[in-house]
Each structure stands twice: as C-alpha cells, then as structure tokens.
Regions:
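FMN-binding flavodoxin-like domain, especially the glycine-rich phosphate-binding loop
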Residues: 3, 7-27, 34-138
C-alpha cells in the first residue's frame, strides 16, 4: 500500500507518524499534477484556507488544484485536511472545495475531512484521532 500525501512536508510526519505503509510525502508547490495519484492506494491532500467572502486556497496549492483533472484520482481512496481560523465564515473551506473536486473526478472519499482550528501542533489529539480513523478506513 502506498499513501500519497500532498501538503506541507512537516504535516506528513504529524498526520501519519507511526504507519508501516509506504508514505510518499510531496509538497503541493513542488509536484507535477500529471498522474500524481496513479498507482496509489490512497491520496491525502492538505491545504490551509482563508478568505472572508469566499474560500481562498493556499497560494502554493492553487496550481495543483487547477490541474486536478490531470492527477488520475479516479478509483483512488482520498481524504483531506486543513488548518484554519474558526472566526472565518468558511472555516477550513479548503477541505470542502478539495473533497468536492476529488469526488467529481472519481476519487473515493473514505473519511470526513479533518478541520483544525489553528495548526497541527496545537491539535495533537484531534490529529491522532483522525489518523487512526484514516488507517482503520483503509
């Protein structure tokens, strides 16, 4: 099994620190979208979001998101996570936007997205719980 993980590299170690599965961590800013998910069992996508009137994806994630039709996600299990600020109208809206697009392209959502108020470090128990549920869903 290989988990393809697209998000900030430090997040890879925090989300799935103790899995024996092969984890292929990639920074969204550094990947080519072409076939990114092909041959993968699971693809995880992490992206911060902000914006008061509408969801704004993290700037370095936007080019990848705009090319999602080329990532080859059809039939691949997917899950998403984001950190954000709960005072914003669209709290962690990146999760909703990314999940919707992956589902539209034939990805198989296996778990409700993780939405964290603040950062991964300050939400350790929530991250651990989500990671355990993710691994159980595989």
């Amino acid at each position: 099994m290989c988990l393809s993980f697209t998000g900030p590299p430090p997040a890879t170690r925090r989300i799935l620190p103790n899995t024996s599965a092969g984890v292929c961590g990639r920074d969204a800013a550094d990947v080519s979208p072409d076939g990114l998910c092909e041959g993968r069992d699971v693809a995880l996508f992490g992206c911060s979001a902000w914006g008061t009137d509408e969801v704004e994806l993290q700037t370095d994630f936007e080019p990848l998101f705009e090319a999602f039709d080329r990532i080859g996600v059809k039939g691949v299990k997917t899950a998403c996570f984001a950190s954000g600020d709960s005072s914003f109208e669209h709290f962690c809206g990146a999760v909703d936007v990314i999940e919707a697009r992956l589902n539209e392209l034939g990805g198989i959502q296996i778990l409700e997205g993780l939405k964290l108020d603040g950062n991964l470090s300050s939400n350790g128990s929530d991250v651990e719980d989500w990671a355990n549920r993710l691994l159980a869903a595989l």
